[in-house]
Amino acid sequence: MAWQGERMATTYNNLYMDIRRQLKQAGYTGAGLEARELVCCGSGKSREEFFRDAQLYVTPEVEEKILSLVERHLNGEPVAYLIGEWEFYGLPLDISEAVLIPRVDTEVLAREAIDYIRTLGKCRVLDLCAGSGCVGLAIAANAPEARVLLGEISEPAVRICRQNIRRNNLTGQVSVMAMDAKAAPSRALGEFQCIVSNPPYIPRADIETLDHSVKDFEPHLALCGGEDGYDFYTAIIRLWKTALVVGGRLYFEVGIGQADTVLRMMRAEGFGDINVVQDDQG
């Protein structure tokens, strides 16, 4: 048994178990993953080093740093912002409060687009409202003949996209450009075989009803879709269809209860063969 002053020392594994228990009691569904990520971040260890050193004792300084992160998380701050990174479709991504945290549900959008794009061979793909670049980067990593452009209006988000392109060694396949999804595209952009978009779609009045961890930490620019939540869908469907080749495809993520309205918008603008795929949230 070891002691740190008046407090008993603890191993990395025991500290992890204690943090996991705290998070579970607080209602966090991903308590095991989040506890491990907080211990790794606070100690400066990789996941492999965490497992290797699980039975080693934690120094008081490192324990204090880890517990400070845990306290911030228990107060609502998302783990992805605390550690500065997150994973999407198997890719490690830099994350900051300038971008939304990639959700597992959005992997459905990426998967559907990837399955189609793989059938095309060489093609051009636009990820509009790219945020961290997660969807476009997943497409590029899984459809190596595609050339992907990430379009994002926020300059801090554009910087995150650049970091993630480099981090995943996709500089030869992916580029990023500042662009406004609610403005008509420049003809100089050319045409794309596929456009994917996970645009802001929360109605303005609903922002205040979101969970504290979303409302108070994630960027409202990336959440708010205008008064009714449809501003970006309206603009992209009407204005960006001109950037698609004949027969090209447009993929959206939509919010709960929005699919029928977006379908009507697309049909009104001449889109056909429209399908809806539900994620695990319905």
Task: Give each language-model segment a name.
Residues 107-209:
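Conserved SAM/SAH cofactor-binding pocket of Class I
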Residues 227-282:
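Conserved Class I SAM-dependent methyltransferase catalytic core
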Residues 80, 202-205, 257:
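Active-site beta-alpha loop architecture of Rossmann-like, nucleotide-cofactor-dependent enzymes
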Residues 23, 117, 165, 240, ...:
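Conserved hydrophobic residues forming the short capping helix/wall of the S-adenosyl-L-methionine
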Residues 38, 76, 106, 135, ...:
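Residue-level signal for inorganic ion chemistry
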Residues 201-231:
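Mobile active-site "lid"/loop adjacent to the S-adenosyl-L-methionine
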Residues 40-115:
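Conserved AdoMet
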Residues 2-51, 55-58:
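Non-catalytic accessory regions of SAM-dependent methyltransferases
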